[in-house]
Swiss-Prot record:
Involved in transcription repression and activation. Its interaction with HDAC2 may provide a mechanism for histone deacetylation in heterochromatin following replication of DNA at late firing origins. Can also repress transcription independently of histone deacetylase activity. May specifically potentiate DAXX-mediated repression of glucocorticoid receptor-dependent transcription. Component of the NuA4 histone acetyltransferase (HAT) complex which is involved in transcriptional activation of select genes principally by acetylation of nucleosomal histones H4 and H2A. It is found in: Nucleus; Cytoplasm. Residues 1-48, 258-305, 411-468 are annotated as: Disordered. Its main location: nucleus. GO terms for molecular function: RNA polymerase II-specific DNA-binding transcription factor binding; transcription corepressor activity. Transmembrane segments: none annotated. The modification Phosphothreonine is found at T446. GO terms for cellular component: cytoplasm; cytosol; NuA4 histone acetyltransferase complex; nucleoplasm; nucleosome; nucleus; replication fork. It comes from Mus musculus. GO terms for biological process: chromatin remodeling; DNA repair; negative regulation of transcription by RNA polymerase II; positive regulation of DNA-templated transcription; positive regulation of double-strand break repair via homologous recombination; positive regulation of protein import into nucleus; regulation of apoptotic process; regulation of cell cycle. This is DNA methyltransferase 1-associated protein 1.
Amino acid sequence: MATGADVRDILELGGPEGDAASGTISKKDIINPDKKKSKKSSETLTFKRPEGMHREVYALLYSDKKDAPPLLPSDTGQGYRTVKAKLGSKKVRPWKWMPFTNPARKDGAMFFHWRRAAEEGKDYPFARFNKTVQVPVYSEQEYQLYLHDDAWTKAETDHLFDLSRRFDLRFVVIHDRYDHQQFKKRSVEDLKERYYHICAKLANVRAVPGTDLKIPVFDAGHERRRKEQLERLYNRTPEQVAEEEYLLQELRKIEARKKEREKRSQDLQKLITAADTTAEQRRTERKAPKKKLPQKKEAEKPAVPETAGIKFPDFKSAGVTLRSQRMKLPSSVGQKKIKALEQMLLELGVELSPTPTEELVHMFNELRSDLVLLYELKQACANCEYELQMLRHRHEALARAGVLGAPAAAAVGPTPASAEPTVSESGLGLDPTKDTIIDVVGAPLTPNSRKRRESASSSSSVKKAKKP
């Protein structure tokens, strides 16, 4: 059964503690349920955060007592939170002043330090860092049989191995401490070569048959060449550094031109292949009987690559579509190609939007695809002509300057105005010597075809004027 307190909670009413304890509801509570009685609560003063101060900074300044932050900096603890030390109630672990010895020292020196009483009798904790290099030891008989060298005496070899044990194979320190007065002056590479040669000999002699050997190898010649190259690199003059940077920049330019030439040759080859494929398919369609053409019209459509011609979308989805939508050019064709295509159609006397019958749509799309392919081939041919003309001018300039031994006409002769590069089924009919020049010399970026034709015509006219 619900009590008065439950009813008060449901109606969101508050009352005195006596009423809440007894569970009685007054008349005012039932008549005016919206009026809530304010609870007596301790009023706390709040301070507004100053403008421009971050919330995190203000939280650091705000103390637990809700006091206002100080206006002036002071040394008192008011306004800042102090970290209290958390002291446990456990018993403190005892520490003891005890002696210890370092195993790395051979003199047996005794030292003292504080350690926990529970660790009494244990080894020195830093003894695990006492790592030494195992330098091999050889006998007199082994030296005479396997390690004898005319350039090294036994006393000098013993001195080298003694320094190797003392300085843990730090050959720079060994070279500094080497007795150059008593023995011959040696370089760091000579010391390394002698040491590792003896280690390899001893490893081969003492090896057990059937075990894998880890023989240290040191190439002294390679190390000498490496240091010599580093010394030359360090001793370069500012002029040499600038020249090297210039050569690196030229190398990057040559590589970029080479990549661009390869890309253009690949695009040109794709265009030629597409032209050959389209011509072959046209011949096949002409040879086929007329009765079978309507049956194979859907299955044997000429497949023009995306890189050449126009790739029209296929409307194979369910639903009703207009046939004129098949003549719509895709978005991949640029505005420049569209304008050139419209100009060629007007020159041929073909309507830009003919009646969209089945046969007309198919033939109109094929015609526009062939026209775009022809436009791309003309552009590629113009690029090649422009590059060839630029290379011919550069070759003649070098020949006049005396850089090339052969005359300009011997390598690349002047071509007549009527000679034009023809496109055959195998490729472009270019001279092999011209291909060699194009592969070796990097051509600059080509401008528009109109500018190319103007520059070519102007250069030819200048040549004719110079001739006597």
